[in-house]
Every structure is written in C-alpha cells, then in structure tokens.
Amino acid sequence: MLSFLLSAIIAFSPAPADTTVSAPSLFGMAKALLGYMSTQATSAEDSTAINILQQAVGALEAGDRDGAIAPFKEAAAQSLSGAASEAGLNVEPVLPAGTDSSLVSRVNPATFFLNIPAANYSGIAPLAINGLEGDFLLVDDKSATEGFRKVHLSFDDNGQIIAAQDIGFIATSTGATGIDGEGIVYDVRRGTVLLAREASNEILEFGLDGKATGRYLHTASYFPKNGNAGLESLSYNTENGRFWATTEGCPEGATQLRIQSYAPYFWPLGHWFYTLDKPAFKTKGAIYAYGVSEICAMPDGSLLVLEREANIPGTSVKEATGAVVKCKLYRVEPAKTKAGKTLEKHLVTRIDTRALDLSFANYEGMCLGPVLKDGSRVLILVSDSQAGYKGILRDWFKTIILK
C-alpha cells in the first residue's frame, strides 16, 4: 500500500517546469485504475486504495489537482506513521484541527467493505470482543422488516478495521415494518438485544434469535414523537448496566434536548439537558439533517455525543456534489452535573466529509471496540449510505483511538 501511495504522489505531483502533463490524461489514468481496482478488490487495503482513487478522480473532474493529491499525502502519512510505529520510532500521527490530543491519539482513515451489504446503518453495538477480533450488531433504519445484522470485524494494532465478514441478518419475531430502527445495544447481563424505534419512541428487548421478550425500556413521555426528531441514540454501559437514550432534535419550541438514563431493570433514572451547537449552514439544502446522531456510554461514566449536520443542496448530480456532512464529537460527564441541569460539553474531535472528494459519510452509529496493546480504546463509527445510493455512497467504517 505504501509503495502505491508514494508512486501516486509522484504521478500526481506538479511536473517540472519543462514538462507538460495534461489533467485529462491524469483523469483518464486515475479513472481507468479505479475501474480496474473496483472489480479486483478483495481486502480492506484494496478498499482503502479505492477510496483514495475515488477522491482523486472527483477532484480531477472538478479541475482541482491539489485536491487530487491531498488524499494520497494523507494516507501516505498514516502509512508512514504506522510503519514507524512498528519500527519502534515515536512518530505523532496528524490529528484533525480542533482535536483534543489529551483524549485522542489517532483518527484513522475511513474504509468500507464490499462484503458488507449496503444499507442505511444507523446503529452499531459490540456483541463479543476477543483481542483484536469481535462480533458486532448493526441496525438499519430502512430495513424492510425489523431486525439486526451480525458482522465480524478484525482490527490491526493501530485500531484500523482491516477485515469484515457478514454473518447474517436476524429478523425479529414482531415482523414490524416502517419502525425506523435507530439505536441498538447488547445487554451483557441478560444476553439480549434492545432496539430503539424512532417512529414510535419505543425501546424493545429481543433475544439474539430475534424473539421478542415482552420487556421494554420505559421511555419518557417528553421525548418528541414528530418523525425524525424522535429517539435516535441508544447506548449501554457494561460497567454499571445503565442504558442511555436521547433524541435527534429538540422538542417543538425547546432549545435543548434531553439525555435520559435508565436503570439495569429498565426504569428511567435521571435526565440531563444538552445544548446543540448552532447550525453551520445559513441556507438549508433540499435534504438537511441536524442534531445528535448517536451517543456512546464510556466505562468511566462519561458520554460521547456525536453531533451531525448534513446539508445536501439538491437531488441532481450537479447539486449533490455540494453535499457536506459536519460531525463533532463531544464528551459530557453526567456524574459531575446534577440531574435536570445542563451538561457542559468538551470537544473531542471533528470530522468533515464532502461529496466532491467522495469522502461523504453520514455517520449515524457509534460504539466501543477493542482495547489496544497500549491500553487505548477503539471507538467505531459507521455511516448510513442510503443503501449505497446510486452506487456512489459507501457504508464507511471509521475508528478513533481514545487514550
């Protein structure tokens, strides 16, 4: 991979003054290589290379040569950092602007896997983790029938996902449709799965075989029941058995949303208010989403809150190239704030993705992954590709390494 990246940097770098290399020829070469690799991809490394080429092709098509070389440089820097680490050299990885380096040691490049079915993944939960391998559960908010998908993920020493295997889809016994499943957790104490339904603001319990147990979390009456502003996020703390849930947006007329905690026996405990950042976009596109897309309960009792603002100017190909998603990850500490009060939030990192460079990723699912050799923890994000919209969008997996 590293030799491929370095070769690409040389190929795409500005030519000497006495040499002429046309952008169309570079575009043709990159597009041809992309087409070939898309049919030959068999590994996570191949998928990463395809992603880089996609970004380069998009930039060249827009006449942005500097933009074409940028993803190669970034990926090469990551590869060099990884190689240096393996060689015992202390090389600090480059972190996104605004990242708190006291909390984050690395933000890995996103990757996708051709053997994981394209879907509308809106939640992810760990089922069983053994070293750098683990089984995880995914929920799809536009699934034809209610259920969850089981996948197996493999990680390298840097916390990057290097392989994925689809184990299969488990339908629930309810046979429900149109429930807009947004959140999923695995209750390690009971060995059961809980699914959050945004359409009805319900959180129901199921066995790993999909059979409903009849038990449910007693959701708060103040959660709004107005379509996409309903239950969006669900998380579970394996240390104390508490559940956490919140909505994507604020109740009508309100300026804050509520994060609700639940006891291991499913009854509500305290709730805290959370203030969203002001929208970054002054003009909303034809498709616009703004709010909390996921929360993640940490072993120390804190919560990670993922704020997501997606703005798509229009549905035509030309308009869609201006699509942008801005994600900001915050940390809050309910234990240090009295219940019923507003949580103070602290920025952990930010992720911006764009359709123009083919990095567009609407991250909706988030959960903890394995613990690495140095004691750091992997945080996994998964995106909603709208079922691989028009063959362009991907179900991206991204990992952030927490200290």
Model-derived segments and spans:
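Signal peptide processing junction and immediate N-terminal pro/mature segment
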Residues: 12-20
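Amphipathic, heptad-repeat alpha-helical segments
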Residues: 21-46
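Hydrophobic alpha-helical targeting segments used for export or membrane insertion
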Residues: 5-12
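Charged, low-complexity interaction regions
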Residues: 38-47, 61-69
